[in-house]
């Protein structure tokens, strides 16, 4: 039971990290492309 909690928490943490990285990359590419 305890293992499932840690697994879900880790999964959410990794997904959040990946989402932030993708969002940051998209914003950076847009900023460099338009310079707005």
Swiss-Prot record:
InterPro entries: PetM_cyt_b6/f_cplx_su7. The chain crosses the membrane at residues 5-25. GO terms for cellular component: cytochrome b6f complex; plasma membrane. It is a single-pass membrane protein. GO terms for biological process: photosynthesis. One of its GO terms (molecular function) is electron transfer activity. Keywords: Cell inner membrane, Cell membrane, Electron transport, Membrane, Photosynthesis, Transmembrane, Transmembrane helix, Transport. Component of the cytochrome b6-f complex, which mediates electron transfer between photosystem II (PSII) and photosystem I (PSI), cyclic electron flow around PSI, and state transitions. This is Cytochrome b6-f complex subunit 7. It comes from Gloeobacter violaceus (strain ATCC 29082 / PCC 7421).
């Amino acid at each position: 039971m305890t293992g499932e909690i840690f697994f879900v928490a880790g999964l959410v943490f990794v997904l959040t990290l990946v989402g932030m990285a993708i969002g940051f990359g998209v914003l950076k590419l847009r900023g460099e492309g338009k310079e707005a």
